[in-house]
Amino acid sequence: MRVLVITGLSGSGKSTAVRVLEDEGFFCVDNLPVLLFPTIIDLVCRSGENVAGVALVMDIRGRDFIKGFEKVFQQISEAGHTVEVIFFDATDEVLVRRFSETRRRHPALESGSVPEGIRYEREQLAGLRRLATHVIDTSELNVHQLKELVHSRIKGESGTRPLTIHLQSFGYRFGIPLESDIVMDVRFLPNPHFVPELKAGTGLDENVRTYVLEKPETRQFLERFMDLLEFLVPSYQREGKSYLTVSVGCTGGRHRSVAIVEELRAFFAGLGLVVKVSHRDKEKG
């Protein structure tokens, strides 16, 4: 039986993920005490129902969950089930804004401010986050994008889709994307920001791309990085991974990282892989 544990910070999108899982045929249970994990899984198995798996939503409301999850996960795995932990996250700023929009109090604390609740929840869930199979940062996602991302990862993990590569550019000044599997820093490449006629452009503009890509150090870097990726992709596939996020960062996320990601798009497409591209900070940098 495939068992998904949906967890993460309050306000990060877990409820949206559950709706996607229900549509995909998962038996979903919200806020179940950790000690009842094995029981509910056993009941679903015995019922004979044709379900895609069991999805259990666990968060800060289940205090005993935080204390006993490792032992229970091991027990479930030893029973022959596959346990995947999907951790939903977002920046503190985004979470505060979401709570403000919904006018809800933070569930982690009966009293105190929302920022205090977020900090406390992060501390309590830190160990679980380290064990996560996937970390999904929803800070920059709308509801439709989040649904698509969850759908892609869930369907891919069941083996119905080929490996999907998500290439994204970002700016280090805005933070590393939390959902990254591979992060490449390209701040060592020549920076168009300091060329007056290129500064206002982006890595999607032909003159900016030419400036970045025609430098000898860029060509050498791409050759070596592509060799590494070509080696890694089959290894990830053998491990059952179906969604690989490769993040490329420069200072502002506007010029170099964008140009490199666009070059990698063609490379991965040439390998016959499904490729999705996003430029997170292109308009910020």
UniProtKB/Swiss-Prot annotation:
Family stated for the protein in its record: Belongs to the RapZ-like family.
Name of the featured protein: Nucleotide-binding protein GSU1884
Residues bound to ATP: G8, L9, S10, G11, S12, G13, K14, S15
UniProt keyword terms in alphabetical order: ATP-binding, GTP-binding, Nucleotide-binding
GO molecular function: ATP binding; GTP binding; molecular adaptor activity
InterPro entries documented for this protein: P-loop_NTPase (IPR027417), RapZ-like (IPR005337), RapZ-like_N (IPR053930), RapZ_C (IPR053931)
Matching Gene3D superfamilies: P-loop containing nucleotide triphosphate hydrolases
UniProt binding sites for GTP: D59, I60, R61, G62
UniProt xrefs under Pfam families: PapZ_C, RapZ-like_N
Function field: Displays ATPase and GTPase activities.
UniProt cross-references to PANTHER family, sorted A to Z: RNASE ADAPTER PROTEIN RAPZ (PTHR30448:SF0)
Coiled-coil regions listed in the entry: none
